[in-house]
């Protein structure tokens, strides 16, 4: 699939052999049936996920089903433009990405088909699916507060909410990445959904005034800033701490991760903001049955166990436990149950609001 030259040669070979065998009707018929079956046994995935572990996931799917997985990787925005350009001729079956906002963008363009599977809709909560089941969550992540216990007291952190971070006592103490980051845009969109735009904008202005430094770096950079005393607290996705504690990013990041603790905000009211990894079947998919099989595979108990143990995300299935590293921080924390689809719907307002608040 992502080796178009090989694919084109295969297509030419198919035509040649069909012509060659034309005069042998029965053999030709059987050959064509076998060839078409083999040719159809694939699923083409466009993904913006950046996890090396996904390759072994695809290999396991092929081993279990016999369906070959072809992958095109890239940034979500670039893949969306590619899908639009390909139109009805697109070979893509699945769009697989992180952040509900990215799924919403594809949905808005009308590029998804509805997922018609009771096996999926019966196990994935409505707030973790597209409004009309255009896409579905495959894993969850929380956007939480990381803090330096030497700088932040237990009384300060105990019932801390996102809203509290706009208070004067946090001035010069907060690290977070830029407003161009989709994770932050979705966080602000969730606040708009819960609090309204006016209240959220006032919050954002005061929140920005409390930054310890100009927004910079990725999520792990924010955690490292707390470990290095450049900030007292940071906002980042939960799984990054798991990655760092696993030593997969080296001893330096392991030592940084050991210096911080993780806090789930808003446990006294609506719960912590969550986002998702998710996927949908594309409208022009040439292999819809295979695509559905892949989604059902991702949401099986065995694969959910595998995924969360590799990615350090949280499972969608309630009977699956997270990686032990993440479970050590708690498994029964309260989550905000607002529809994650609202992150995409409210994204334009969130981006404009962040700009008005001075969030760089």
Q: In which residue ranges do the predicted regions lie?
A:
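Bacterial N-terminal signal peptides
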Residues: 25-36
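Periplasmic-binding protein-like
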Residues: 141, 204-208, 213-217, 254-283
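Extracellular/periplasmic bilobal clamshell ligand-binding domains
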Residues: 324-360
